[in-house]
């Protein structure tokens, strides 16, 4: 694995010179191998080690290099054709392969090669980009988008129209992470490497980036880039220092533990926030 990483790191340093026509066989094979390992879930761009999320930057670099070394090509789809550098994950799947993998894909859901989809996952008509990791028991609902290299935990519900930001456009240092047992409400956006910690509930229409204030109304504490575990979050506003205008923020209205989350429905948590 170290040899593979070295090839990727060296190629990335000279990425401006690389084209599909001049890519050497060693670099091409290394990038292809990494994409295949990401696709199978054997590798992932970020993982939790000793309680902390660690981003493997060299894997992200391999994803970026894949765009440098590959030409656009014609790809056949069910209703139309595509023209892109990255093949679709399910292009060569047959019924037996889908049964072995153990997830459902509802048309016209699109998943790029290099994204991992775990067992018991349901993909409604949605989009999952290259390098993403979607863990077991997760629902990606209609028109939801899982961005490049984003990490989605077990038993997560991404509601209709949710946007989980990627790392490629614009280029981000770390992927956006949704930990296990989270609920992300319809049309919400979580981007720029924000981490939503385990068991959190994000209401409909909440937008969280690195500069978004995440205000805990119980403690008065303000978080940036991280939603603490077990938070129930709605959209809100905070007054300016002068008090003559207010700016958007996300508000933690309550905290719940796993036991409460298991007993109480999501709708009840969001309806009783006063």
From Swiss-Prot:
Keywords: Acyltransferase, Amino-acid biosynthesis, Cytoplasm, Diaminopimelate biosynthesis, Lysine biosynthesis, Repeat, Transferase. It is found in: Cytoplasm. SUPFAM superfamilies: Trimeric LpxA-like enzymes. GO terms for molecular function: 2,3,4,5-tetrahydropyridine-2,6-dicarboxylate N-succinyltransferase activity; nucleotidyltransferase activity. InterPro entries: DapD_Trfase_Hexpep_rpt_fam (IPR005664), Hexapep (IPR001451), Hexapep_transf_CS (IPR018357), THP_succinylTrfase_dom1 (IPR023180), THP_succinylTrfase_N_sf (IPR037133), Trimer_LpxA-like_sf (IPR011004). GO terms for biological process: diaminopimelate biosynthetic process; lysine biosynthetic process via diaminopimelate. PROSITE patterns: HEXAPEP_TRANSFERASES (PS00101). It catalyses: (S)-2,3,4,5-tetrahydrodipicolinate + succinyl-CoA + H2O = (S)-2-succinylamino-6-oxoheptanedioate + CoA. Gene3D superfamilies: Hexapeptide repeat proteins, Tetrahydrodipicolinate-N-succinyltransferase, N-terminal domain. Substrate binds at residues 104, 141. Pathway: Amino-acid biosynthesis; L-lysine biosynthesis via DAP pathway; LL-2,6-diaminopimelate from (S)-tetrahydrodipicolinate (succinylase route): step 1/3. Its EC number is 2.3.1.117. The keyword Transferase applies. GO terms for cellular component: cytoplasm. Its main location: cytoplasm. The keyword Repeat applies. Belongs to the transferase hexapeptide repeat family. PANTHER family: 2,3,4,5-TETRAHYDROPYRIDINE-2,6-DICARBOXYLATE N-SUCCINYLTRANSFERASE (PTHR19136:SF52), MOLYBDENUM COFACTOR GUANYLYLTRANSFERASE (PTHR19136). Homotrimer. This is 2,3,4,5-tetrahydropyridine-2,6-dicarboxylate N-succinyltransferase. It comes from Edwardsiella ictaluri (strain 93-146). The gene is dapD.
